[in-house]
Regions:
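Small-residue-centered hinge/linker elements
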Residues: 2-116, 123-156
Length: 156
């Protein structure tokens, strides 16, 4: 009985070794990594502010995004050859017009440099500066039927 268990275990290990060696293949010690095409997603939520982080703005708000952080993500997507498209995921009531203009210019540079599509999607809200960013350089803008959107303008 013990002999049968031992023989079965040896046979099982032999079969497993063959299967593993077949799956592993022969790559001469080189690691092969395949990176599929990707879509870069940039989230723009909360108040849109100028600067590089939330401590740079006048009111020291902690919820929101800054033009510097968004522009950095756009540049990273432009530099990554595996990125085939850019999606802006927007849920913001707006913010600084200056920040929106900075982000818009960076999006236009992205499109000119890469020729890759830009798509904006809006969640609960896409208003004011956020809406301006969405329509600035996007090939398509998508919103839910209940998305609060629009309101590009100024008060005099």
């Amino acid at each position: 009985m013990l002999k049968k268990i031992f023989i079965s275990a040896v046979l099982l290990l032999a079969v497993l070794s063959i299967v593993v060696s077949m799956l592993k293949g022969n790559n001469n010690g080189e690691k092969t990594v395949s990176v599929p095409d990707r879509v870069a997603v940039i989230n723009i939520s909360g108040t849109i502010m100028s600067g590089t982080d939330s401590n740079d703005n006048l009111f020291n708000q902690t919820s929101g995004v800054t033009s510097g952080s968004i522009m950095k993500q756009i540049r990273e997507a432009a530099a990554d050859d595996s990125v085939k498209a850019l999606v802006l995921r927007i849920d913001s009531g707006g913010g600084s017009a200056t920040a929106a203009e900075e982000i818009g210019r960076e999006l236009k540079r992205f499109k000119e440099k890469t020729k890759k599509p830009v798509v904006a999607t809006m969640g609960n809200t896409g208003a004011s500066a956020a809406y301006w960013i969405a329509v600035c350089a996007s090939d398509k803008v998508y919103a839910n039927a209940t998305t609060l959107t629009g309101s590009i303008g100024v008060y005099i």
